[in-house]
UniProtKB/Swiss-Prot annotation:
This is Small ribosomal subunit protein uS14. One of its GO terms (molecular function) is structural constituent of ribosome. GO terms for cellular component: small ribosomal subunit. HAMAP family: Ribosomal_uS14_1. Part of the 30S ribosomal subunit. Contacts proteins S3 and S10. NCBIfam families: PRK08881.1. Gene3D superfamilies: 1.10.287.1480. It comes from the Bacteria.
Length: 101
Protein backbone atom coordinates (compact mmCIF):
# COMPACT_ATOMS: atom_id res chain seq x y z
CA UNK A 1 0.00 0.00 0.00
CA UNK A 2 1.37 3.39 -0.99
CA UNK A 3 1.47 6.31 1.38
CA UNK A 4 -1.96 7.89 1.49
CA UNK A 5 -0.42 11.34 1.00
CA UNK A 6 1.04 10.27 -2.37
CA UNK A 7 -2.32 8.93 -3.52
CA UNK A 8 -4.12 12.11 -2.42
CA UNK A 9 -1.50 14.33 -4.11
CA UNK A 10 -1.96 12.42 -7.36
CA UNK A 11 -5.75 12.85 -7.14
CA UNK A 12 -5.29 16.61 -6.64
CA UNK A 13 -3.09 16.68 -9.73
CA UNK A 14 -5.84 14.97 -11.75
CA UNK A 15 -8.27 17.71 -10.71
CA UNK A 16 -5.80 20.47 -11.65
CA UNK A 17 -5.08 18.84 -15.03
CA UNK A 18 -8.81 18.67 -15.77
CA UNK A 19 -9.31 22.31 -14.72
CA UNK A 20 -6.61 23.67 -17.04
CA UNK A 21 -6.90 21.15 -19.91
CA UNK A 22 -8.88 23.40 -22.27
CA UNK A 23 -6.63 26.43 -21.66
CA UNK A 24 -3.44 24.36 -22.16
CA UNK A 25 -4.82 22.85 -25.35
CA UNK A 26 -5.69 26.28 -26.76
CA UNK A 27 -2.26 27.72 -25.92
CA UNK A 28 -0.44 24.72 -27.39
CA UNK A 29 -2.56 24.98 -30.55
CA UNK A 30 -1.54 28.64 -30.93
CA UNK A 31 2.13 27.80 -30.38
CA UNK A 32 2.11 24.90 -32.85
CA UNK A 33 0.18 26.67 -35.63
CA UNK A 34 2.56 27.62 -38.47
CA UNK A 35 0.65 30.80 -39.32
CA UNK A 36 0.84 32.31 -35.84
CA UNK A 37 2.64 35.65 -35.57
CA UNK A 38 5.90 35.46 -33.56
CA UNK A 39 4.72 37.94 -30.92
CA UNK A 40 1.43 36.02 -30.50
CA UNK A 41 3.41 32.78 -30.15
CA UNK A 42 5.66 34.39 -27.49
CA UNK A 43 2.58 35.56 -25.57
CA UNK A 44 1.11 32.06 -25.70
CA UNK A 45 4.37 30.51 -24.50
CA UNK A 46 4.55 32.97 -21.61
CA UNK A 47 0.94 32.23 -20.67
CA UNK A 48 1.62 28.49 -20.83
CA UNK A 49 4.61 28.87 -18.51
CA UNK A 50 2.47 30.80 -16.01
CA UNK A 51 0.03 27.91 -15.64
CA UNK A 52 0.58 25.71 -12.58
CA UNK A 53 3.23 23.04 -12.95
CA UNK A 54 0.73 20.36 -11.95
CA UNK A 55 -1.54 21.37 -14.85
CA UNK A 56 0.64 19.27 -17.16
CA UNK A 57 -0.83 15.79 -17.73
CA UNK A 58 2.60 14.12 -17.65
CA UNK A 59 2.81 14.84 -13.92
CA UNK A 60 -0.14 12.53 -13.19
CA UNK A 61 1.07 9.09 -12.17
CA UNK A 62 -0.77 5.91 -13.13
CA UNK A 63 -1.58 4.10 -9.89
CA UNK A 64 -3.25 0.84 -8.93
CA UNK A 65 -6.89 1.63 -8.13
CA UNK A 66 -6.90 -0.91 -5.29
CA UNK A 67 -3.80 -0.06 -3.26
CA UNK A 68 -2.11 2.85 -5.08
CA UNK A 69 1.01 1.00 -6.23
CA UNK A 70 2.79 3.32 -8.72
CA UNK A 71 4.73 0.78 -10.78
CA UNK A 72 3.81 -2.11 -13.02
CA UNK A 73 0.33 -0.82 -13.88
CA UNK A 74 -1.70 -2.55 -16.57
CA UNK A 75 -3.68 0.44 -17.81
CA UNK A 76 -6.34 -1.69 -19.50
CA UNK A 77 -7.39 -3.00 -16.08
CA UNK A 78 -6.20 -0.19 -13.81
CA UNK A 79 -4.34 -2.54 -11.48
CA UNK A 80 -0.71 -3.51 -10.92
CA UNK A 81 0.79 -6.68 -12.32
CA UNK A 82 0.74 -8.25 -8.86
CA UNK A 83 -2.91 -7.40 -8.20
CA UNK A 84 -3.81 -8.51 -11.74
CA UNK A 85 -2.32 -11.93 -11.12
CA UNK A 86 -4.15 -12.31 -7.80
CA UNK A 87 -7.47 -11.23 -9.27
CA UNK A 88 -7.05 -13.48 -12.31
CA UNK A 89 -6.35 -16.51 -10.10
CA UNK A 90 -9.50 -15.78 -8.08
CA UNK A 91 -11.55 -15.39 -11.28
CA UNK A 92 -12.44 -11.75 -10.62
CA UNK A 93 -11.45 -10.63 -14.13
CA UNK A 94 -13.95 -11.87 -16.73
CA UNK A 95 -12.42 -13.41 -19.82
CA UNK A 96 -8.95 -13.78 -18.32
CA UNK A 97 -7.59 -17.30 -18.18
CA UNK A 98 -4.15 -18.64 -17.40
CA UNK A 99 -2.31 -19.75 -20.52
CA UNK A 100 -1.07 -23.29 -20.89
CA UNK A 101 0.38 -25.08 -23.87
Amino acid sequence: MSKLSKIVKNEKRKVIVARYAARRQELKRIIAAPGTAPERRDEAQAALQKLPRDASPVRVRSRDVVDGRPRGILSRFGVSRIRFREMAHRGELPGITKSSW
